[in-house]
């Protein structure tokens, strides 16, 4: 994710993730999966982390800074209802599949209970996609019967459709 964000240099990084990923380093590695959002903030001006439900004490302290907004799973629907306004700021959307509740997407490396429903993930993708210059889905593995991969594929499709529809509207092609 971090190199892709660096390539498109968005102003806002939006991620669906169970974890804050704001560590300075993890096991001596500044590029660990536990440090992604911290690295991204070297490029993006702001990070919005949707669905986060775990992090170290230092990560929660870093999340208190002005450039980070954390939206708990129970508050994601309210965030969507408030119709987030990106204005003319560019965004990058990253979906870490562990944002989903592990009951619907167990195929990930670090499951956390009480996650988001597929509908919530889809709604975030549809809302943010029109503002995006980049998108990814990460941390999907084969530890289940394909549930996580199927959800990831559907979210990719939703992104492509929503992004293309917004581009068509902007070009005047209805």
Feature annotation, model-predicted:
Residues 1-174:
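Conserved alpha-helical scaffold segments that buttress catalytic/binding sites
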